[in-house]
Amino acid sequence: MPKHDDTLISTAGVDADVGYGAVMPPIYLSSNYSFSAFGEKRAHDYCRSGNPNRDMLVEVLSQLEQGAGGVATSSGMSACDLVLNLIEPGSLVIAPHDCYGGTWRLFTARAKQKQIEIAFVDQHDRQALAAAFARKPALLWIETPSNPLMRVVDIEALVKEAKAVASKVVVDNTFLSPALQKPLSLNADFVVHSTTKYLNGHSDVVGGAVIAANPADAEQLKWWANCTGVTGAPFDAWLTLRGLRTLNLRIERQQASAGVIAERLAQHEAVSVVHYPGLKSHPSHAIAAKQQLGFGAMLSFEIAAAPEHVRDFIAALDVFTLAESLGGTESLIAHPATMTHASMAPEARACAGIDDRLLRVSVGLEHVDDLWAALSRALAVLPAPKQRAARRLEAAK
C-alpha cells in the first residue's frame, strides 16, 4: 500500500472497472444488484445497503484516517446522528459548549426526546470537565478546531480522561480533514466529517462520513446506516472522491493564504480579535502545532465596531461570498450569530463567546493579494478609531 496520502487519494478507485477497463471509476447508479444464483448474493444487493462508489470513498477515507472502516452518509449531520445509535438510550454525551450550531441543535433535540442526555461543557475548563466525566458519559464529542471560534483542545489528553471512565470519543475533523489532523492516531474511536467541505472541496455535494478505529464499531455503523437509511447517494460519493484527489494541493494553498490574512487582520485597527491557531498569540497555538500537520484555512474575527456595522462591512466586501458552508475553492464569509449558529439559543451563543460582531472566513484558492485587498476595502468603511472611542464614551454616559 502507498505510504503517502497524496498517492492514496490519487489512485483511489483507479482501474476498479474490470468490465471495460475504465481508468476512472464509473458511477454505479443502479438501485439493486442481481443475485448470481438462488441464495448467492454478490458483494452488493441493494443500494441503501452498499454501493461501489460509496465503498471506494469509505476505503480511501479509512486509509487516510488510519481507521478500520465506516460509512458515507447523506450529510454531515446524518453522520453525527448515526454515531448516537451506538450508545444506549438515555446515555450521557459530553459535547463542547462552542460547537457547530447544527450539532448543538441535534444534541438538544435528541435530549428533549430522551434519546440522550447532553452536557455542553467548556472543554478547556478542567473543573467542569472533571465534573462531567464523574457522571460516566458514554460519549465524549470533540470539535477541534471549534466552529467558529477556532478553539483547540488536546485530543490525546481528553481521550485518556474519557477512556478512564469507559467513554468512547468522537472527533469532528471537518475543519482540518485528514490532510492536517488524524484523530484516530491520537486514540479517538470515531472521526466524523461533513464531506461537503474540504473532502469534496468544490461546493457541489452534500454528504458526510464516519470512520471507526476498530472493525466492530465499523460494522455497527454499517448496520445502523442500512437500518436507518442514511447512506449517501452514488453520484455524491463519486463527486466527493473526484474532489478528494486534489485535497492536499487545495489545502496547501488555502492554508498559506489564511496564515497571511490572519496576520494582517491581527494588525488592523478595525479588528478587535482574530481567532486562528496559526497565530502565536492564539491560546492553544502550541497544542495545534503538536497534534496538527498544519493550521488550516478557517479563521474568524470580530470587527472593532458596534454589531450594526457588520452589515456595512458585508455590503462593502467583494471577492468573498456571503454564504454558509466552507472548504470550497471559493472564499466565503459568514456571520455565525445569524447564519451557521442561528439555531443556538442566544444564551448558548453568549456562553460560547459567539459575539454578534464575529465573522467566519473560509479561505479559498483566489490570490491572497486579491483577498486581502477586498477585506481592506471593507474594513475601511467601518468607523475610524476616534469615532469608535467617541461612541463608546457617549454610550457610557
Regions found by a protein language model. Name each.
Residues 259-327, 331, 344-350, 389:
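Conserved small-domain helix->loop->beta segment predominantly found in fold-type I
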Residues 27-28, 36-56, 60-63, 332-357:
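Glycine-rich phosphate/pyrophosphate-binding loop
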Residues 70-268:
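Conserved PLP-enzyme active-site core in the AAT-like
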